[in-house]
Regions:
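Class I S-adenosyl-L-methionine-dependent methyltransferase catalytic core
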Residues: 1-173
Length: 173
């Protein structure tokens, strides 16, 4: 099985770096509070690796970056709708008891399989990464982490990146 790699541009590489740094800080803070489990949830995990449009080098995707963070997250929940990306993700990550790869629509997977297990009373916290390929995310999914007690961190980048990406494509960077 060959690993499926999407080609990404400068802004996606920058976004991956920002997410990696934020996730590292988040994990350090929560790991220092021994009573908490802290999960990493990626709703649009992709295939695990990308190819840089500028350097042509392999670039680790957000799931691989998260798996390299020290101290590690307690659990990882990685979701994607594309069966080829799921297959690639499984090939890149291998079998790990702390990694749960979910194949399906993130709206349903998060609301039915992941979010119900993030209970305040069980001392579970999560960094939820919502970075859709398009604008196809239900509002209920975006809103749900904010309803947890205490509110969970989550990120979405599509609206921030799109105007700059359009300028880049027009050669105005």
């Amino acid at each position: 099985m060959s690993v499926r790699s999407d080609e990404i541009g400068y802004w996606s590489e920058l976004k991956l770096e920002i997410v990696r740094k934020y996730a590292t800080a988040y994990s350090k803070i929560l790991a220092a509070q021994k009573r908490f489990e802290h999960w990493y949830v990626d709703a649009f995990a992709g295939g695990g690796v990308h190819v840089s449009r500028t350097s042509r080098q392999m670039v680790p995707g957000s799931p691989l970056n998260a798996l390299l963070i020290d101290p590690p997250f307690t659990e990882y929940h990685l979701v994607d709708l594309d069966p080829r990306k799921i297959e690639s993700l499984r090939a890149v990550i291998g079998k790990r008891s702390d990694v749960h790869i979910h194949s399906g629509n993130c709206d349903e997977v998060l609301l039915r399989q992941v979010f119900p297990h993030l209970n305040y009373s069980d001392f579970r916290r999560a960094l939820v990464l919502l970075d859709p390929y398009g604008l196809d995310l239900r509002w209920e999914v975006s809103r749900q982490p904010a309803n947890f007690e205490p509110p969970r961190s989550f990120s979405t980048f599509q609206r921030w990146i799109e105007p700059q990406r359009s300028l880049d494509q027009a050669g105005e960077r």
